[in-house]
Amino acid sequence: MIGAFARKFFGSANDRRVKGYQSRVKAINALEPEIAALSDDALRARTAEFKQQLANGKTLDDLLVPAFATVREAAKRTLGQRHFDVQLIGGMVLHEGDIAEMKTGEGKTLVATLAVYLNALAGNGVHVVTVNDYLASRDAGWMSQVYSFLGLTTGVIVHGLDDVERKAAYACDITYGTNNEYGFDYLRDNMKYRLEDMVQREHFFAIVDEVDSILIDEARTPLIISGPLDDRSEFYNTIDTFMPNLEKVADYEIDEKQRTVALTEAGMEKIETLLREADLLKGDSLYDVENVSVVHHINQALRAHSLFTRDKDYIVRGGEVVIIDEFTGRMMPGRRYSEGLHQALEAKEHQPVQPENQTLASITFQNYFRMYKKLGGMTGTAATEADELADIYKLEVVEIPTNLPIARLDEDDEVYRTQNEKYAAILAEVERANARMQPVLVGTASIEKSEVLADYLTKHGYKQIDFGDPKSMRKLYAAARAGKPAKLFAVLNARFHEQEAYIVAEAGVPGAITIATNMAGRGTDIKLGGSLEMRAQFETADIADEAEKQAKIAEIKADIERFRGMVLKAEEVVEIEPAKGSKPAKTVTHPGGLYIIGSERHESRRIDNQLRGRAGRQGDPGRSKFFLSLDDDLMRIFGSNRLDTMLQRLGLKDGEAITHPWINKALEKAQQKVEARNFDIRKNLLKYDDVQNDQRKVIFEQRVDLMKNESVAETVADMRHAFVEDLVAKHVPENQYPEQWDVAGLKEELKRVLDVELPVDEWAAEEGIAGEELLSRIESRVDEHMAAKVGQWGPDVMRYVEKTILLQTLDHLWREHLVMLDHLRQVIGLRGYGQRDPLQEYKSEAFSLFESLIAHLREAVTGQLMRVEIVPPEEEQPALPEMEAHKLDPNTGEDEMALAQSSFARASLASEGSEGRSRRDPNDPESWGKVGRNEDCPCGSGKKYKHCHGRYA
């Protein structure tokens, strides 16, 4: 209470910060007449003047006022739009590297031009990040008019561009693209072998549109570039046939809050029986160590069948299982669940099971965007996640006042006992709104729910149409002109994502009914009366004559204005029945405008606020209401049984709803609990990912340094000497007498790893020889061996071979390291049972693994360079490791490794030996011939070849 009083008296911290920008807003406004008087050429010349001032020592902050005034005037001349004062404040927040929370329709896209232009003057490149290719292309095409007028270049990164096009786009002053494309380009760049092949520049400044969606909703989803492993499709299909035999509760239990599933004792026995019948069980028990892989597959199949629902979590399309974004309802083609879950879903849906993948490179959005020296963001809903954004990204959320007061009415939720009662109430509400020609947007939580609602409308006389189809739209426009409801509706979910922009843009036409999953269509405004841009695109496409086209556009404008007036007047007058003995009935007027109906609450308040925010843009009237049932996920998980009992005691009849602000508050508290839990999960995951991220930065920085150096001979020599030192120290310890030295072991290992025969036994037998002298002689002979290769091939060829082997070996070992870190991560939680901190244990063991990686790198590079031979051109083979030669997982969109291979087609490593398996001598690697990476090592160690002698092959 005291805090509320203080805020009322002194103002909130947000109010004070917004107030602090007013002096600069006034200064920008004062410059407006002067800037407006400039010619186009003079206005354009200001860019060069600003750059010169920066070169002379001024800062970007010094140039903010004149630069913003310049952009405002350029926008007026090119777009016919003038930045409002509140938009200037939004631009300042972005420039300072914080998040501007601006309500729907307040012009976030235009706001970005202010901070983008100012920071682009530094010449380091500015990245504008959007959630999909459509918005990236749209915003780049639209705002490039302002930038090009002022002499700056604009590029756009979308799916399907080749490296030449990408590099050109990144070289521009300003680059638009999606979060996925930026992240994947970063990963692919760090798999390149030449600096000139890398496409991205440094990470200077980025503005993230819909920042909450990218930095919070997608924070737990890593970007992964991967390559296929062995085909195990039959195994997945076999395991899948077991699932129908299991019964919920009796054989497995589900924890919906934690999204986990576990077999019961009876379920384990049933699975063991099925595995024995299929001859897949090794030993006596499912949980014997040799069945670890089988248990993993069982668990993933169980998750696929019990936790993942078709048309809610994923969709089957074109023979593929495509993930659906739980927050936006959009399909995410190319994204695949990891650890065999996606393969389990493919088996469940009887689709072709794709091979499992090995991670080649990965990064989370959390760590990618933290690489930028400065980061800003825009969204309509970030205040509820302000703590997380400040904690993880050091970004403050500043709520920007709206240009006009919000006129939307947010009504209390209506809670029904069953889904059917809820849908009946939604139908009745839609019919009332449709009768008065008020456009309605119904938000659903999944494709499944959107299609249930669509079926419900269809059964009651409504017809589903495509808002992207001109013929269908003409029917809707004709009905609107006549003022009669057409009873037409459109569905926007992952099945119809191609029409997303059209459906959302026309959702404000009188009588339009749109069913949309969550926040699909985010980024496209719903304008009351419809979109001039979309209608002009439809209705003038076949008109060649310019005069006729302009006349048609004028006609459309008049139509839209008339439609807008109809929507604004679509008010509802409701009579409230009086209680017994009270005064006569009262009437309440509910506003017109867009009517938002939520069909259930989401786990996050922010998603609900986003849905509400579709209505009431730029001071327009609007209303929103959520219709809930006790069967809804959130209600069911958070104690609907108690509420159901209470409603029955209160005598709530079928079809009746309960409405009270207390219910809204209770639901918000439940949502806050979920949000807090999800925040803790993301924060904890980040702590683990930071360990890998620190190692990733070291490896990637080293790769770039190696590529920058014309010669890596010195690095290779240091690695060679360090390896020889380690080898000698292992067999000839400092504090031992010569007769205690393992001379035979040293000689054998020098032959096996370095392929050199040295008289180590003779040297060690010399009177008075010390370990240091022995080391010096070995190093000299090894250096002579390498010098002979340089003399044989020439320094140019040797430089190329050294760099090639060093980079490809580093990449190979890094991939193996990622697999080991992943395995460590999966089991480290068990350390908690031993009263040890899993995170500290993970850090310690991850560091040990990293040290081991460096040691293996020295050994492998030295061994390969000592053995490498030039192959004649007609027998050339790619120099890249086998794993790199495969096509990448679809989530990258490109076979980047094929490009990398081509740059090394001039050299290869000679194979040591070619004899068949039957003649392999465990003690003679030269007799092994070609050994598969996943075969047991012929030396008899019991390890896979790739983890044993394969390191040196």
Swiss-Prot record:
Residues noted as binding Zn(2+) in the record, renumbered to the chain: 937, 939, 948-949
Topology relative to the membrane: Peripheral membrane protein
Segments for region (Disordered): 873-953
Source species, domain of life: Bacteria
Keywords of this entry: ATP-binding, Cell inner membrane, Cell membrane, Cytoplasm, Membrane, Metal-binding, Nucleotide-binding, Protein transport, Translocase, Translocation, Transport, Zinc
Biased composition range(s): Basic residues: 943-953
EC number: 7.4.2.8
Sequence positions that bind ATP: 87, 105-109, 525
Annotated localization: Cell inner membrane; Cytoplasm
Family annotation (InterPro entries): Helicase_ATP-bd, P-loop_NTPase, SEC_C_motif, SecA, SecA_CS, SecA_DEAD, SecA_motor_DEAD, SecA_preprotein_X-link_dom
Cofactor remark: May bind 1 zinc ion per subunit.
Pfam family, one: P-loop_SecA
Role of this protein: Part of the Sec protein translocase complex. Interacts with the SecYEG preprotein conducting channel. Has a central role in coupling the hydrolysis of ATP to the transfer of proteins into and across the cell membrane, serving both as a receptor for the preprotein-SecB complex and as an ATP-driven molecular motor driving the stepwise translocation of polypeptide chains across the membrane.
Protein name, UniProt field: Protein translocase subunit SecA
Organism lineage: Bacteria, Pseudomonadati, Pseudomonadota, Alphaproteobacteria, Hyphomicrobiales
